[in-house]
Amino acid sequence: MDNKLNIVIITGMSGAGKTVAIQSFEDMGYFTVDNIPPNLIEKFVGLLNTPDNKIDKVALVVDMRSRAFFEDIQSIVTELTDNTSVNFKLLFLDANDTELVSRYKETRRSHPLAIDGRTLDGITKEREILADLKNLSEVVIDTSELTPRNLRARILQKFATSTESTFRIEVMSFGFKYGLPLDADLVFDVRFLPNPHYISELRDKNGTDQEVYDYVMEHPQSEEFYQNLMKMLVPILPAYKKEGKSVLTIAFGCTGGQHRSVAFAERVSAALREKWHLNVSHRDKDRRKETVNRS
């Protein structure tokens, strides 16, 4: 098994998409650093490349914002390439002059090397400075015709391993009386189901307890809802992934977030976990118990 530290340096033309790139690596679980001065890279890698280090993937953005130190970058790239204790790749993002000028006009920002505000002059100068670095790059992506979503997909295609999940599903339960979860993408209200709260022997239990789970699921409307829900979810989840979404949060709500919503979150997460990278959580499952204990 290869336990080497994986390092990707992201560089290229200003305006070519380095922000999208570093966000894509973050979604793949990389530890990311934006605009690191090149002369600090060797020391930074040394701190991480130790036996007790728990960070195994690092993506660093180096560009002309660090121009005072940029002359060091080629020697550092050479050193990392020759370093047998790390896996190193250099990613260069490029775009044609017309597209770069258009992007700068759209954002109304100045090019870091622009002379007297002339964007094209800055682009020309930057292209000359980066020419040798581009030739050293293992991966070059021209973003001229790529949308941010397309660029993200291209990066995932080239850098994501078969064992990495770039799309994660968060299944959660909550109680409406405590408010909607702000980060939920899909919210399902299960308050139409019979409430175990009114069964004395179930009141103090929750949807992770087998007795409560069985009570919730034994009703015909529960099974009908579950079957219809899965018919909807199964085809749309791949579409969310294809659109470039990194996390999809599916929330189930009942009155207090203790019984019905918990049971359904458990059942749905168990079904989806066979195919998807998934986490399940219960925001309000123990809130009533905590309130009673404080009183």
Swiss-Prot record:
InterPro entries: P-loop_NTPase, RapZ-like, RapZ-like_N, RapZ_C. GTP binds at residues 63-66. It comes from the Bacteria. Keywords: ATP-binding, GTP-binding, Nucleotide-binding. Gene3D superfamilies: P-loop containing nucleotide triphosphate hydrolases. GO terms for molecular function: ATP binding; GTP binding. Belongs to the RapZ-like family. Displays ATPase and GTPase activities. This is Nucleotide-binding protein llmg_1557.
